[in-house]
């Protein structure tokens, strides 16, 4: 990677950080969004200027198709439907991580990580972990999208031994990753993908539709770590930095939301977020989850309200 490319990626990373800073407050959100767009533009132009790019025609076609689809969705989407749109986009990031890892496994020479059957241990670890996170993100986001859109029931789906099955699957994925890094067997690679797909579903189905915003934020974190995994596979510092930013900010936001709703952050990670609601469904029906707010929340709602009624 040339010095100029490294410098451009560094500038993009700084712009992404400033973008997150701007998006943290309504008054600076527009500026933060602009800085994010600018950073992404610099990153794309820098990547396309790489001499290693083989076909601008194929990239141009992909840009055109993706741009048309994205523009069409952005024009038609309602503000109330943004959470499920974000969940759908997260699923694509996870699937991309799986595809990149598969490409690196079957054609490692294209990624400068050795040859088939003799990939370095470090690259195998990065590849397999990125694959697992990406696969979990993909299926988890699909279920979240379905719940928010109404394609899947928003009621928590809880069954006996659920956490035990999740634990077994988690340990099984770890064992498969270790075995894959030793044997470099393609069957093990796809077993990792399949097991991660399954646990991604099992982690989200016990969560109620009303609590989906927290899960979307958590899946945002997962997609960030998946992107960071892609960055390690591609030896791309910008992807690593950006993925880490998205991953950490998504996790922090999820923690803040859980704290504000008196929920356990650990339950989000373990897929037991909706369990308490499901277990207490037969109790007093008038119980509601208390939602905390502060002066900043009240000021924001009043500032953006068209009509205010004071009783």
Roles of regions detected by a PLM:
Residues 1-13, 50-68, 123-138, 184-195:
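Structural signature of hydrophobic alpha-helical transmembrane segments
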Residues 1-56:
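N-terminal transmembrane signal-anchor/hairpin module of polytopic inner-membrane proteins
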Residues 15-28, 67-86, 141-156, 199-212, ...:
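C-terminal ends of transmembrane helices
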Residues 28-39, 59-62, 81-93, 156-168, ...:
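Cytoplasmic-side transmembrane-helix entry/capping segments in multi-pass membrane proteins
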Residues 47-60, 72-83, 98-116:
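Transmembrane alpha-helix boundary signature
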Residues 103-117, 182-187, 214, 221-242:
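Transmembrane helix-loop junctions at the membrane interface of multipass transporters and ion channels
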Residues 208, 222-266:
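Mobile "lid/hinge" segments at catalytic clefts and subdomain interfaces of large enzymes
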Residues 245-305:
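Membrane-interfacial segments at transmembrane helix termini in multi-pass membrane proteins
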């Amino acid at each position: 990677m040339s010095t100029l490319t490294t410098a451009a990626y560094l500038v993009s990373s700084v712009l992404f950080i400033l973008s997150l800073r701007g998006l943290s407050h309504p008054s600076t959100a527009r500026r933060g969004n602009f800085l994010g767009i600018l950073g992404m533009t610099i990153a794309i132009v820098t990547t396309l200027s790489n001499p290693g790019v083989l076909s601008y025609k194929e990239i141009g076609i992909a840009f055109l198709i993706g741009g048309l689809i994205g523009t069409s969705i952005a024009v038609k989407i309602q503000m109330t439907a943004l959470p499920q749109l974000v969940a759908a986009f997260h699923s694509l990031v996870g699937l991309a991580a799986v595809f990149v890892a598969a490409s690196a496994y079957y054609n490692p020479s294209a990624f400068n990580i050795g040859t088939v059957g003799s990939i370095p241990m470090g690259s195998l670890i990065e590849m397999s972990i990125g694959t697992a996170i990406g696969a979990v993100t993909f299926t988890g986001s699909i279920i979240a999208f379905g719940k928010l859109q109404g394609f899947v029931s928003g009621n928590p789906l809880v069954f006996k031994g659920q956490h035990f099955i999740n634990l077994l699957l988690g340990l099984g994925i770890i064992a498969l990753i270790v075995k894959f890094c030793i044997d470099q067997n393609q069957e093990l690679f796809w077993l990792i993908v399949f097991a991660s797909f399954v646990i991604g579903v099992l982690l989200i189905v016990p969560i109620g539709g009303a609590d989906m915003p927290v899960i979307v934020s958590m899946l945002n974190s997962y997609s960030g770590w998946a992107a960071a995994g892609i960055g390690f596979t591609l030896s791309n510092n910008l992807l690593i930095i950006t993925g880490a930013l998205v991953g950490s900010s998504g996790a922090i936001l999820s923690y803040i939301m859980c704290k504000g709703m008196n929920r356990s952050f650990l339950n989000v990670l373990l897929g037991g977020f909706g369990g308490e609601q499901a277990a207490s469904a037969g109790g007093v029906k008038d119980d509601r989850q208390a939602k905390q707010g502060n002066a900043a929340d009240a000021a924001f709602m009043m500032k953006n309200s068209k009509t205010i009624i004071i009783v």
